[in-house]
Curated annotation (Swiss-Prot):
HAMAP family assigned: CCA_bact_type3
Protein name (record): CCA-adding enzyme
Co-factor requirement: Mg(2+)
Species, as recorded: Pediococcus pentosaceus (strain ATCC 25745 / CCUG 21536 / LMG 10740 / 183-1w)
Family: Belongs to the tRNA nucleotidyltransferase/poly(A) polymerase family. Bacterial CCA-adding enzyme type 3 subfamily.
Amino acid sequence: MPQEFEDARAVLQKIEDAGFDAFFVGGSVRDTLLNKPIHDVDIASSAYPAEIKHIFKKTVDTGIEHGTVMVIHDGEGYEVTTFRTESGYQDFRRPDQVTFVRSLKEDLMRRDFTINAFALKEDRTVIDIFDGLSDLEHKIIRAVGDPHERFHEDALRMMRAVRFASQLDFKIEAKTLKAIEENNMLLGKISVERILVEFEKMMLGSKPNRGLEDMLTTKLNEYCPGFKDRSKELDQLTKYPLKLLENPEQVWTMIAWSLKLTPQEVMPFLKQWKTSNDLIKNVSATLQVLSMDKNDQNERLALFNAGEANVVNAIRVAQILGMNREAWLDTYQNLQIKDTHEMAITGKELIQKGIIKPGPQMGQVLNRLKLMVINDELKNESLALLNAVNKLQKDD
């Protein structure tokens, strides 16, 4: 049993000593059975919220209307949720009604997939009502009960299925896969932000090609921003070793490349996905580098504008696409300056020396100096830069 569970066993024991049932549940149990590290400890109990609050001295009402109370034990917070049933999913995401129950089976019946429907007792006994252990052994993702019902309860579960296929390298069971295809339009009811989280996790999983293939097979992509009618382009992605992708910037650069987007088209495309402005800026810069011809005369400027992290991202995406662009990093690292602030002279100094007056001309001169330094046409030294300014003014 992982240390996180060992630390929380006393919480289960205290609930059981009070006459109630308590179990570890959810993905952490699955990951424990797969010998993977766990991230969250979720506890489910037959005790109602008021009863949990009576058992423990320190509690916080984190989601009491849904049956969740945080118990503070040894300075750690553990969320304890009452066994419950759910009904009415008008938004295809959250239940309209939650009913507290005393039955573990009724609670586990509302879980998404059999591999997530385990309960683990304090004595390490695994409760497996839906043959999840068999599915875990055979690497199968299968909906609990009727897959159509599960996806109508929460349409995001369809994206979770393809995400798990990628993260775990599991196969989606035939009826579950068919139900995803038949209910794919429900994904349109889910917020883009939630789809984004699942999609990025899928693309950064250990087998992203598998997840993406399942996504295209079930046509979930038709209900994702900017992916409608782009199955052919997205399918081309599955021909590349996507497991080499390391971060969201590389994921979206790879996608932008496959959709033949220009750096300028990246912003409206990613705005649909509601990604951060930083990610949009980085993907645009990375794509700008990636789009260069091998001996592009603006190569040094593009690398300077991109910055080291985006140059590294461009090299990785190029590698995935079968291109060797390792030289870009050497070129970048040998630039005299990596930032405008590193210029050996500033506009303020030029004004103080009476060499130039404030205004548009000063900005133009400084830009020309910067470009000359970036292209190694000029040393980034005060005297050399001052001489260059005088020469530029005479020429003008």
